[in-house]
Each structure stands twice: as structure tokens, then as C-alpha cells.
Amino acid sequence: LFQEERLISIIDYLKSNKRITVDVICELYDVSRDTARRDMVKLEEQGRIVRTRGGAILPTLSKEVGNYEQRLQAESSSKLTIGKAAAGLIQDGDYIMMDASTTVLHAATALSSKNNVVVTSSIEIAAILTRKDQTTIHILGGVLDNKHHSVYGAKAIEMLNDYHVDKLLIGTCGITEEGLSAPNEEDSYLVRAMMQHADQVIVLADHSKFGKRLFHRVVGFDSIDILVTDQALSPEMKEKLLASEVEIVYAEGDDLHD
């Protein structure tokens, strides 16, 4: 097996058995201990496992996310690839809504369509879009979150009642087979409200977000139309998404669709 295939298989094993050891990886995949350790290091870097003495377990509840600068730097190449693929889903004249995700920021940067109207809760995305002459920008009001460079609160949700868009682009801090999750109530409320004012919901999620569960559940997969990601999904995750009629776009090479 190639490494990525082993990594997916290791996660599947952990979902069934809760814990895996270096020796088990060596036995299951006929690899050396050094290769088994490299696989675990890779999964740990992706946030998909927690390493223990001699092995690994799946991560438990994630309690925090980094500030804006930290999130922007994390998995930056994956986010760039996903952002470009998501921007390719936008057509001339589309009315769009964008949340304050750093992956969505890359979609805003890559946007090449003309005559778009964009509603956003992100001051960074609004600033980027000012460089695009044929784009009209609406910024939601509310409380400014200095840590995440975005607005939130009752005023922002109330303002959404003035808009309805063709497409909503959102990121997520965590995605499991139960759906999307966020670290705080404000994010959950705002994203849910945005979904009520969009014909199509497009979620941008790099590989590090899978298997990560945060305190507040946002929505299940029935509320999503398209998922744009950068790596192959586990069979269980793919089955859950397709059962909810979610279109999967792999942002690698020639964008693949399921």
C-alpha cells in the first residue's frame, strides 16, 4: 500500500479498535517499525491521531482553535488548493456569501468570475475583494472578533434577513461522521443562519479537519450540497456524505467529483 492508503486504513482500524500500536501497523501492512512510526507522525501532524506510548488513539474533543494568523498558516498549501477549486465553482453574476474561514479566504483570493455580489462576515475577505473591480461587497455588522477578524452576534444574524444568495462558502473547524462542529456558539449560530439564506451550501475542509470534533455541533450533512477537500476520504465518511447526497470535489490535479 502507498502511505496515504495506509493512513486511511489506520484511521479505519482505530475507529473499530480504539487503539493501534507500532507492532500492529507492522503486522497489518508488512512494513518496518520506522515506516510505522513515520505513518503515525504524519497522522499526528494532520491532527487525526494522538500518539501514546508505543501507539496511537483517535483524538477526543478538541477544545481550542488558533487565532487568525495561526489558522492562516496551518495547512496553507492544502487551503490554497481547496480555495482555487472552490472559486472555480463560482460563475459570473453569482450572488455569494462567505464566512470568515481562512480556507474561504483563499477562495476569495482566487475568485476570477465577474459581476459577483459578496456578503461576508470577514474583514479580511472584504479587504481582498476590494481589489476585484467588478465585485460588490456587503459586510455584516455586529461585534468584531479581534482574534478571528470577523463579526458575529445578533446584529450580524439580523442583517442576514436582508439577503439571499446563490452560493454560500463556509469552512469548518471539525468534521466527523456526525457533521460539522465549531468551538463556540456564535460561530454555530451565524453559520446556521447563513445557510437559511443560500440556495447552495459549499463546505471547504482540508484533511486536518476530519476526525476532529469540537464542542458545538453546527449541522449534519443533510444541510450541505458540496464538500471541497484535498485528500481521499475514509469509506465510512464517503458513504455518509453520499447518503446525504453531498457532492464531493477533490481539489487535486483534475478536480474529481463523486
Functional labels for PLM-detected ranges:
Residues V65-G66, M97, V104, A182, ...:
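Amphipathic, positively biased hydrophobic alpha-helical segments used for protein targeting
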Residues F2-D23, E27-L28, D34-A100, A108-S113, ...:
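HTH-adjacent hinge/linker in prokaryotic transcriptional regulators
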Residues M97-M98, V119, N184, D230:
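Active-site-adjacent beta-strand anchor residues
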Residues T103-A107, F210-R213:
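Short glycine/serine/threonine-rich phosphate/pyrophosphate-binding segments
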Residues I57, T103-H106, A126, T176-E177:
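Short, active-site-adjacent cap segments at secondary-structure transitions
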